[in-house]
Amino acid sequence: MKRTMITMATIAASALALAACGSAESVGGNASTEGSENGQTTLVVGSQDYYSNEIIAEAYAQALEGAGFTVDRQMRIGQREVYMPELEAGSIDVFPEYTGNLLQYLDQNATARSSDEVYDALRSTLPKGLRALEQAGATDQDSYVVTADFAAAHSLTSIGDLANAGTLTLGGNSELRTRPYGPTGLSNLYGVTVNFTPIEDSGGPLTVKALKDGDIQLANIYSSDPALADGTLTVLTDPKGLFLASHVVPLASSRVNDD
């Protein structure tokens, strides 16, 4: 079957610019896809059930279409427990991911911490048939957030300060309960004990409302969330590296080849 050459570096640069994620060379150098000719090759682009990830995926899709490919969009699939099996099965060809979080999903005992270490470890840990293309400079980190009033009342600046803040309830997606940076990680690394309330909107408006209403005292919110910009919320620093560096990185199936 004839391979059709596409300039994936151009596609990625366009996609990340559209998504306001900064510059990256990647969906990876000179690449080829299995197919006959541009316009007859269909690539499946997927996204997480989170708005900023969907924006990046849509930007990838539009850039691929601009290069002459037919794109099948499968957006807002869900979280990793749902979409990773589809990626491993080859049902999805291009998917925006985050280096640190994906590494910890695949290897809860990962010891890499710096951006380059995390990226290298991820590339060596990915299941057969999946590749991490070049990571972007941009990150979209998990973070732990309290209200500004709660931070002031308890003199909070870092995650470790929560150990002296009384009874705490953490809110986040249900899978946070078992993530390495969830309640167990908070306890093991910082000595912070929390109760947990699942809120299934990936740190979105429902989580922010629960935090501001006092239903929870601590929230898992992504660093790119615009709700963090108005001064009513405080992002706690993470000096011990509970959260790994999480750069935007395209995952590609074996149908997209660096030739």
Protein language model features and the residues they cover:
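Periplasmic-binding protein-like
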Residues: 129-131, 136-140, 224-259
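Short helix-initiation/N-cap motifs at beta->coil->alpha
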Residues: 51, 73-85, 195-209
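Short, well-ordered beta-strand elements
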Residues: 38-52, 60, 69-74, 166-172
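Ligand-binding pocket segment of bilobal, Venus flytrap-like solute-binding proteins
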Residues: 167-238
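A conserved helix-loop-strand patch within extracytoplasmic ligand-binding domains
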Residues: 115-170, 254-257
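C-terminal motif of bacterial Sec signal peptides marking the signal peptidase cleavage site
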Residues: 15-20
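Ligand-binding "clamshell"
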Residues: 106-133, 215-218, 227-240
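Bacterial signal peptide processing site
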Residues: 22-25
